[in-house]
């Protein structure tokens, strides 16, 4: 991946230009890759390590996005910074293609700056139907699931585009703070994530 193709999450959040990787560029890098887009630009990140299901995806400038079952559970090196997000109880995100409409999720967020710790947020999931989604040069028919977040100053929607066969989240838009969301697109998934759930 060339230097011009890899930009950090920090750049994405601070208004640097977007990055549009090609299928050939992604294929040339042996590591799993995601594209993360903030309010004003994008970054390509590679999978660095996995610890008990928590994946750490790194940019060239060492900004990090942490995912678990495709859900953003932390960021590092950007502002705002999601220091931690935990789900209370069982996570529906491991098999999002099988959820019942109206399923609720209890979340707890720790966000910097301003030491916003322990923010309790309820997510309500709704199945919106199948949609065609373009990723690189492929078109996929994916199940669109919306999660409406409310509580503790939050009023945002998360969106997930999920493989209807195995529940893998190919694309999502997820809040990392009450006023900031990231778009995450799987360019070259970690192969074990594609197994049936």
Question: Across the structure, where does each feature detected by a protein language model lie?
Answer:
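Acidic, serine/threonine-rich low-complexity disordered tracts
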Residues: 1-83, 99-197
């Amino acid at each position: 991946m060339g230097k011009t193709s890899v930009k950090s999450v920090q750049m994405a959040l601070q208004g640097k230009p977007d990055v549009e990787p090609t299928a050939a560029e992604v294929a040339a890098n042996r590591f799993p890759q995601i594209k993360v887009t903030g309010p004003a630009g994008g970054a390509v990140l590679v999978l660095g390590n996995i610890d008990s299901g928590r994946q750490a995806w790194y940019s060239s400038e060492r900004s990090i996005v942490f995912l678990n079952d495709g859900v953003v559970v932390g960021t590092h090196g950007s502002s705002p910074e999601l220091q931690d997000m935990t789900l209370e109880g069982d996570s529906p995100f491991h098999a999002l293609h099988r959820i019942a409409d109206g399923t609720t999720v209890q979340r707890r967020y720790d966000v910097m700056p301003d030491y916003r710790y322990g923010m309790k947020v309820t997510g309500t999931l709704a199945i919106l139907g199948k949609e065609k989604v373009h990723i690189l040069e492929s078109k996929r028919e994916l199940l669109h699931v919306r999660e409406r977040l409310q509580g503790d100053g939050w009023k945002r929607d998360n969106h997930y585009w999920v493989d209807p066969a195995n529940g893998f989240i190919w694309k999502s838009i997820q809040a990392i703070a009450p006023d900031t969301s990231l778009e995450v697109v799987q360019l070259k998934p970690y192969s074990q994530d594609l197994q049936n759930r």
